[in-house]
Amino acid sequence: MDLLFFDIGATLYGTDASQVLRIDRALPEDLTLAELGLPHRGNRAIVFDTPEGEAHLKVDAVHGVRSIPVNSLRRMPPTAGAAAYAVGVCLEEARTVLLIDLVETARTQGRH
């Protein structure tokens, strides 16, 4: 599976690269989500499609797309009580990276 890795604040996240339309400059009204942490600068935005049109998530850095073996991915169990946008984790080298669904992230903010 191809994942896009990015930073919000000091935290590394990943998302399904097929959800991403492009990386752009961030605008003041772009989406931030306190639960993911606030960007230090938030100069970049991940642009993705929602049923209502494009949405933008502010990020600090984009690390690019990497193909990750499926056996390195874990779904978030329903009993974990995680937010709807937290779909799983990626076991990346010596750390665990939270994988988020961009469309669910926008819905969390009422931007759907």
Curated annotation (Swiss-Prot):
Annotated keywords: Chemotaxis, Transducer
Top-rank taxon, per record: Bacteria
Coiled-coil features, chain-numbered ranges: none
One GO biological process term: chemotaxis
Protein role: Necessary for proper aggregation of cells to form fruiting bodies. FRZ genes define a system of signal transduction analogous to the enterobacterial chemotaxis systems.
Name of the protein this chain belongs to: Frizzy aggregation protein FrzB
Upper classification of the organism: Bacteria, Pseudomonadati, Myxococcota, Myxococcia, Myxococcales
